[in-house]
């Protein structure tokens, strides 16, 4: 996902320009927090912000791309850019200590020293505490750029010491249009209608990961799960792909079930159709029970991240029986 360039991700343009405007006017903060998920291009935006800070001939629209600093960045060889990424599932205290030590050294290119930390929510407690001192007293010409996927997982003492860059995520229509420009959408049907692929955004994570899914067989697998859940919930018996789910596939399949249940409730009192069939009219009590059931499915998705093993077929059959009982099917 990091292979994209800033210009290829139009929803990042406004946030990037806001960062450039502040820095161009010389009012740059010493610490910036970018609450932009990797699946939206968070690392791409973070790199562009680092380029803005380090560029020696900054233009009103961003880094010049031609100065010595920009050329070093292009070659991934800038001595004053210090990047920290998770080591496994965590950012560890030794990584932050080494970073803080590097930031005390004189800038080799005579400008700023920039620390770029991606997935900063993965700081363990010791690493977060080690970073706090640098956030409080960063030193002259030190700029920290922190990219996160989940600000809620950060210590308040970290977020309060950073300037959060405003960012507006793209809506589904913008994402669909972007995917069309990438020539990734399935061919229109016989009526000329384009298939809406954004239904699974919450499963894959965002537009960049959805693009990867469309390039591979992953998206088609998600679509198959949705079709097979619809058939299985109607018949009361597992069918097709749900009979042979592996432990690696079950989380995706249950995430799709969660989305299907929510869609079922949303459309139950409308004249719209679900999977080509008229939606049932459900009373509010049944709707509430189905919403609660969907929540149970989502909780299981989270538990499965750490469970050593699970009987996927039995679990799916249990959910089908629960659905039939709730809907008196």
Model-flagged regions — what are they?
Residues 1-52, 69-72, 140-142, 149-329:
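Charged, glycine-rich active-site and insertion segments that engage polyanionic ligands
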Residues 1-126:
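Clamp-loader machinery-focused feature within the broader ASCE/P-loop NTPase space
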Residues 104, 129-146:
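Conserved catalytic/switch belt of AAA+ P-loop NTPases
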Residues 118-124, 129-132, 136, 152:
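Catalytic acidic motif of RecA-like/P-loop NTPases
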Residues 101, 133, 160:
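Conserved adenine-binding aromatic site and its adjacent loop/helix in ATP-hydrolyzing domains
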């Amino acid at each position: 996902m990091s292979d994209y360039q800033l210009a290829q991700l139009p929803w990042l343009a406004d946030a990037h320009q806001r960062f450039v405007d502040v820095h161009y006017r010389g009012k740059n903060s010493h610490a910036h927090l970018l609450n932009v998920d990797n699946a939206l291009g968070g690392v791409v935006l973070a790199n562009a912000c680092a380029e803005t800070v380090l560029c020696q001939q900054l233009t009103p629209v961003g880094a010049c791309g031609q100065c010595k600093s920009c050329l070093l960045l292009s070659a991934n060889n800038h001595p004053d850019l210090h990047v920290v990424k998770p080591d496994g599932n965590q950012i560890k205290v030794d990584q932050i200590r080494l970073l803080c030590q590097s930031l005390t050294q004189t800038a080799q290119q005579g400008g700023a020293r920039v620390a770029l930390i991606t997935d900063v929510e993965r700081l363990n407690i010791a690493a977060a505490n080690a970073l706090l001192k640098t956030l409080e007293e960063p030193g002259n010409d030190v700029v920290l750029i922190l990219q996160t996927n989940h600000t809620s997982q950060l210590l308040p003492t970290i977020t309060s010491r950073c300037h959060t860059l405003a960012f507006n995520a793209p809506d589904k229509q913008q994402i669909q249009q972007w995917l069309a420009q990438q020539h990734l959408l399935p061919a229109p049907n016989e009526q000329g209608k384009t298939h809406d692929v954004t239904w699974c955004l919450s499963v894959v994570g965002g537009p960049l990961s959805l693009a990867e899914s469309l390039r591979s067989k992953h998206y088609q697998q998600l679509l198959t799960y949705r079709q097979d859940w619809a058939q299985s919930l109607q018949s009361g018996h597992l069918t097709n792909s749900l009979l042979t789910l592996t432990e690696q596939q079950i989380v995706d399949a249950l995430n799709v079930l969660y989305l299907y249940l929510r869609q079922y409730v949303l459309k139950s009192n409308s004249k719209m159709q679900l999977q080509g069939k008229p939606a049932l009219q459900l009373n509010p009590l049944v709707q509430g029970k189905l919403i609660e059931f969907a929540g149970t499915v989502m909780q299981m998705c989270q538990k499965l991240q750490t469970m050593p093993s699970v009987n996927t077929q039995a679990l799916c059959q249990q959910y089908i029986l629960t659905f039939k009982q709730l809907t008196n099917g």
